[in-house]
Swiss-Prot record:
This is Glutamate--tRNA ligase. InterPro entries: aa-tRNA-synth_I_cd-bd, aa-tRNA-synth_I_codon-bd_sub2, aa-tRNA-synth_I_CS, aa_tRNA-synth_I_cd-bd_sf, Glu-tRNA-ligase_bac/mito, Glu/Gln-tRNA-synth, Glu/Gln-tRNA-synth_Ib_cat-dom, GluQ/Sye. It is found in: Cytoplasm. It comes from Staphylococcus aureus (strain Newman). GO terms for biological process: glutamyl-tRNA aminoacylation. Its EC number is 6.1.1.17. Signal peptide: none annotated. Catalyzes the attachment of glutamate to tRNA(Glu) in a two-step reaction: glutamate is first activated by ATP to form Glu-AMP and then transferred to the acceptor end of tRNA(Glu). It is an enzyme of class 6 (ligase). One of its GO terms (molecular function) is zinc ion binding. It catalyses: tRNA(Glu) + L-glutamate + ATP = L-glutamyl-tRNA(Glu) + AMP + diphosphate.
Length: 484
């Protein structure tokens, strides 16, 4: 194990970057950067059936978008490569041969049907399913007989009996496993491909990984990996297992849970900001001192302390994510937010696919109107429905406002002045409303609320003069005249 902090994020290229995996990558990144160490990305691609053609590219693209810059990987070899497991067979094979030669591993010829029958029988007896060791001591004659039958062997690790495997987890504290509860497990599958627990231990050792930080669904893998380290006389890395991420029902976040968007790609498509998502994910199972919740990446690196990783499950709060992103949206200049929102405006046919300067100018005004309210760039479409949909039927409260005694007088004066107004801009509209106030004597809520309800159908919203400008003269006059 290296004295220098070296951590790794090791995804399989089987799909988009999941929130849970993004958190694993992010905490490893913060830990490495806090201690001036190395953040390594290794691709665990030995499951060829599940690998997607663009799975690896997607992982790297989304990690880069989040701001997780790696020090080593397939594109940055620092002497510890190859960084794809599929390219490391030449490293694994001599070690497999060594374990076989030292009788620390053996060939198992049992078929899938035989193993399944054993498993079902154990479950029927109320026992924990585990391999019973039927082929742990085959004679050479028995091995030859199985091979003559055409059976392909897997290779199993010979688990030492009556031994306790313990490790001091940086999150959970001391964790122990009794080896008698772990059957001899497969280190090489029948197709010759090393299994996860074997390959990952070998890779972590040869890449001099100092700390393995991952989700607590990997706790049960840890004793098997420690066995591999001990079999070769190597020092294991330090381990840290992060708490689960749970949904509103406090159930483990599942990829089948349709209530929560779970892939970074989905948040990108909606127009979330990478620094906001970074901020939100960094607080899933970790907390800083104090009450502050908004930090830059550099601030997170400075204050990160692995001792503050939580043992309790981390709640994925959709409202909290929306709030965090809104804080960042408010800080951005309008042009940045407009460029993020533009594809959404085009998709909703609010702006033509080939927009004119006039279209773009209108779009910028629309964004300026809603920027402080927006949780994400794509939200501009539902927020601004009044600009492109028919006026909704008024609710009871809105009806009371618009049926006020002074409303016809108010609308008549306002309609007349706005009809003649040029240029139709917010500053001039504001002056016009003040003139109407002086002429009619109507003021306060009796002035502003009926105007807002008449032109938007809503009781509340952004600055009224700005809203009227963005709606445009024709639409505003059409909406006002029915209340004259």
């Amino acid at each position: 194990m290296s004295d220098r902090i070296r951590v790794r994020y090791a995804p399989s290229p089987t799909g988009y970057l999941h929130i849970g995996n993004a958190r694993t990558a992010l905490f490893n990144y913060l830990y490495a950067k806090h201690y001036n160490g190395d953040f390594v990305i290794r691709i665990e691609d030995t499951d060829k059936k599940r690998n997607l053609e663009d799975g690896e590219t997607s992982q790297f693209d989304n990690l880069k978008w989040l701001g997780l810059d790696w020090d080593e990987s397939v594109d940055k070899d620092n002497g510890y490569g190859p960084y794809r497991q599929s390219e490391r067979q030449h490293i694994y094979q001599p070690l497999i041969d060594q374990l076989l030669a030292e009788d620390k591993a053996y060939k198992c010829y049992m078929t899938e049907e035989e193993l399944e029958a054993e498993r079902e029988a154990q479950i029927a007896r109320g026992e924990m399913p585990r391999y019973g060791g039927q082929h742990a001591h085959l004679t050479e004659e028995q091995r030859q007989q199985f091979e003559a039958e055409g059976r392909q062997p897997s290779i199993r690790f010979r688990v030492p009996q009556n031994q306790t495997y313990s490790f001091d987890d940086m999150v959970k504290g001391n964790i122990s496993f009794d080896s008698n509860g772990i059957g001899d497990w497969v280190i090489v599958k029948k197709d010759g491909i090393p299994t996860y627990n074997f390959a990952v231990a070998i890779d972590d050792h040869y890449m001099q990984i100092s700390d393995v930080i991952r989700g607590d669904d990997h706790i049960s893998n840890t004793p098997k990996q420690i066995m591999i380290y001990e079999a070769f006389g190597w020092e294991p890395p330090r381990f840290g297992h992060m708490s689960l991420i749970v949904n509103e029902e406090r159930k483990k976040l599942s990829k089948r849970d349709g209530q929560i968007l779970q892939f970074i790609e989905q948040y990108r498509d909606l127009g979330y900001l990478p620094e906001a998502l970074f901020n939100f994910i960094a607080l899933l199972g970790w907390s800083p001192e104090g009450e502050e919740e908004i930090f830059s990446k550099e601030e997170f690196i400075k204050i990160f302390d692995e001792k503050r990783l939580s043992k309790s499950p981390a709640f994925f709060d959709k409202q909290k994510l929306a709030w965090v992103n809104n804080q960042y949206m408010k800080q951005k200049d309008t042009e940045t937010v407009f460029q993020l929102a533009l594809p959404h405006l085009i998709k909703a046919n609010l702006i033509p696919e080939v927009p004119s300067e006039e279209d773009l100018s209108w779009g910028r005004k629309l964004i300026a109107l809603y920027q402080k309210e927006m949780s994400y760039a794509g939200e501009i479409v539902p927020l601004s429905e009044m600009f492109f949909k028919e006026m909704p039927a008024l609710g009871e409260e809105e009806q009371q406002v618009i049926n006020g005694e002074q409303v016809p007088e108010l609308m008549t004066h306002l309609f007349s002045k706005l009809e003649a107004l040029e240029p139709f801009e917010s500053a001039e509209i504001k002056k016009t409303i003040k003139e109407v106030q002086k002429e009619t004597g109507i003021k306060g809520k009796q002035l502003f609320m009926p105007i807002r309800v008449a032109v938007t159908g809503q009781m509340h919203g952004p600055e009224l003069p700005n809203t009227i400008e963005v709606l445009g003269k024709e639409k505003v006059l059409n909406r006002l005249k029915q209340y004259k």
